[in-house]
Amino acid sequence: RLYVRGLDQLDPVPVPGSDGGILPFFSADGQWVGFRQGNRLVKVALAGGPVTPICDATGDTYGATWTSADTIIFASDSGLMDVPAAGGIARVIARPDTGEAFRWPDVLPGGRAVLFTVFARGTVKLAALDRRTGAVKRLQQPGAYPRYVTAGFVVLSDPSGIISAVPFDARRLEVTGAAMPLADKVSTASDGDRNLGVSSSGDFAYQANPSAGSRLVLVDRNGAARNAGSDTGFYYAPRLSPDGKRVAVARWADINFATRDVWVLDLVQHTRTRLTFD
């Protein structure tokens, strides 16, 4: 389920009808939120109402942006697609070359161009699509998940989770200066996704990488929590045994999430046993 929380509020509010929703994006006026639900893109008004289908999305999707002209542009394995926000059949507007992948679009003010990320041969760089001509301009600026700020900057994130701002000429679609670091340790994924949101005015919110790791806890029906006997680490998908006496859990070796193994925690004997060594 998706949630919305005002930056001046402490409590998130569930988005109605968003069960199973992923990859959310706001409409240009901020009154609607679109997202992927199952094998389709849908939208719902934040004020309430039914979930409305936009288009089929049977393959993977990698981010979407909603233009002021009420068109939605999203990235797929076929390239950049667009579809009316009112619903319809999506069409390809930019195809990647062999060995490339297009990800994480962001429309520029006025809708004339779209920024996005190009993955190619181990590199991650900024690119721009001129919607009037259909031409793709591959820039040499490293970085993923571009977000344009009306003051004339593009906010980018690198694979290590550092957020930077680069001066950008939105008319010429050119980077005009050096990158300036803004923050680091942003939670990232291998496909370039970032737990990062940027407003047009330049305010941004992000989720930091859990560099210190976490501990497993047990929570009873009354909400009381106690340590499950784990040390600090990077855990994934814990499962309780039927008798409730043991926990099986995957644990990554470190923050790079390169390798992981399965461990079993004995909640009675307070012991830990490693089952795999891959």
Indicate where each model-derived feature is located.
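Acidic, proline/glycine-rich low-complexity intrinsically disordered segments
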Residues: 1-278
